[in-house]
Amino acid sequence: MIAIKDAHFLTSSSQLFQCPASLTSEMVILGRSNVGKSSFINTLLGKNLAKSSATPGKTRLANFFSTTWEDKENALRATFNVIDLPGFGYAKVSKSLKKEWEGFLWELLSVRTSIKLFIHLVDARHLDLEIDKNAKENIQALLRPDQAYLSLFTKFDKLNKNEQHRLFLNAPKPFLINTTHFNALSSKYPTLEIVRQTLLKYLLTNPS
């Protein structure tokens, strides 16, 4: 079983020079405002590190967290950074600030070679939003051979059983499912342990 031995906040940045040095593999968490990024990060890491803004789209910083993962069964201990990007879709900012903000994020994703995994959170109740399609296309256009893109559906526990089953069968692969109530799900759906194992695999291996 994978245990998160340490998870702590590193820094926030709004410009590339403010980002911490790229000393370890990193995963990026992105998604629309109110998609549940903070809940996912806190559940994944077992600690309330990521904060939700009361105003959707208000947070315009990339937040960096250092995490240490341990898998005793396989004698593995590794450190990774988690990068929490601002939610997109609701930002009520001036055009000039929005352009500067998007420019920083695009540059961050383009040039930071330590990023190995992009995790795109999508609301399971709204699968065909244009903003999510555009985000997926833009990220996939950036991917290098040593990087991977993964969809992860949030709000899964808000669906009825038939909707859950259809999503599980029909969603484009690869994908994962997240809920803050993992234990309430049927055993046929991924558990928190499976989510952690999957992410660890992507962070440790070259997907090409």
From Swiss-Prot:
Q: Which domain of life is it from?
A: Bacteria
**Is-annotated flag, keyword Protein biosynthesis?**
no
Residues annotated as binding GTP are 31-38, 57-61, 84-87, 154-157, 182-184
**Which keywords, in A-to-Z order, does the entry hold?**
Cell cycle, Cell division, GTP-binding, Magnesium, Metal-binding, Nucleotide-binding, Septation
CDD domains per record: YihA_EngB (cd01876)
Cofactor(s) listed: Mg(2+)
Domain spans labelled EngB-type G: 23-205
- Locate the residues binding Mg(2+): 38, 59
Q: Kindly list the biological process annotations in GO that this record carries.
A: division septum assembly
What the record says about family reads: Belongs to the TRAFAC class TrmE-Era-EngA-EngB-Septin-like GTPase superfamily. EngB GTPase family.
What is this protein called in UniProt?
Probable GTP-binding protein EngB
Species in which this protein is naturally found: Helicobacter pylori (strain P12)
